[in-house]
Amino acid sequence: MLVIDELHNVLAGNSVNRREFLNLLRFLGNELRIPLVGVGTREAYLAIRSDDQLENRFEPVMLPLWEANDDCYSLLASFAASFPLRRRSSIATPDMARYLLTRSEGTIGELAHLLIAAAVAAAESGEEAINHRTLSMTDYAGPSERRRQFERELM
């Protein structure tokens, strides 16, 4: 299996480069006879749709946003266990999950950025645990906030 992450970046190239890349994907699928998995945003799907043969080889699957449930608590517990902090980070709770998911807008990549920033703040401050205090110390801005900041700068 060949997993291609950030597949939407194919759209960054010019039309000739895009076509060459899509041809390469088709060639790899045919020659290697292995499944291809493309991961990316909505734009990744649009790039694949531009080639009829490739579109038939990919089945789009939408990943849902994370919700505060047992799977999420397990994910948060795994994150907490992975950070080299001296104190236990109690982030795998319903209240903390809702707070974290609201700030990260429910995506795992944003959640990881937020928690890494909080772990750094916890270590640098001597707190040695992720909690509301260390989360408020981060300079993390979620996707919507970053867009608003960018749009303000354009004005």
Predicted regions and their residues:
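Walker B catalytic acidic pair
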Residues: 5-7
